[in-house]
Amino acid sequence: MFGLKAKSTKKVLGSIPKHIGIIMDGNGRWAKKRLKPRVFGHKAGMDALQEVTITASELGVKVLTVYAFSTENWSRPQDEVSFIMNLPVAFFDKYVPVLHENNVKIQMIGETSRLPEDTLAALNAAIDKTKRNTGLILNFALNYGGRAEITSAVRFIAQDVLDAKLNPGDITEDLIANYLMTDHLPYLYRDPDLIIRTSGELRLSNFLPWQSAYSEFYFTPVLWPDFKKAELLKAIADYNRRQRRFGKV
């Protein structure tokens, strides 16, 4: 049940996007500004994610997909990669209880084969603990790359055609969507209404290229660890000033 404050905020904001995607960028620069190592920024970003998730849940957002680690991030320094891979363990250990209390359901997209065993175990434990929750879906994009996702979908479709499970004429946009990693999401909420990128960068970086065809984009110079409740509300207010046409006049 929403509190009076949450209801009032929703009324002021107007329409709430059902699916928000966030490219969480700027952790390293945030740490550098404070003369700290990059990993310090990643840890602060973990706390920002918890606050944004709870806020989105209170507002009635259905899906929050966060770009936690891309397939390209493996090229970063090994000590940083190792730290980032341990972040889900720390995040779930610290925040799963409060997320569970708020009816948040944890899911993920991405290739799991390269994930360390303890990272995968923590992720699976969080997914299992929250699997019966019916509130916001916190969808981690972990070792995710949009082009790789589409390539994998094409391979599976081609194999099903070869196996006579599909005819080429059966291939539609909806069918392709069913082969993507987001097929586990509720059908009406698979594609983000709003994609937010922090830190001032103006690109998608291989994040949900298929699903974002008609998304609205919000770019902010705010670094991710500083992106808290007020910044999310500002992004949603900006979203509400736009008219979504989906290619129409």
Curated annotation (Swiss-Prot):
UniProt keyword Magnesium present: yes
PROSITE patterns per record: UPP_SYNTHASE
GO biological process: polyprenol biosynthetic process
GO molecular function, one term: ditrans,polycis-undecaprenyl-diphosphate synthase [(2E,6E)-farnesyl-diphosphate specific] activity
Residues at which substrate binds: 26-30, 38, 42, 70-72, 74, 76, 197, 203-205
Family (UniProt): Belongs to the UPP synthase family.
This protein's name: Isoprenyl transferase
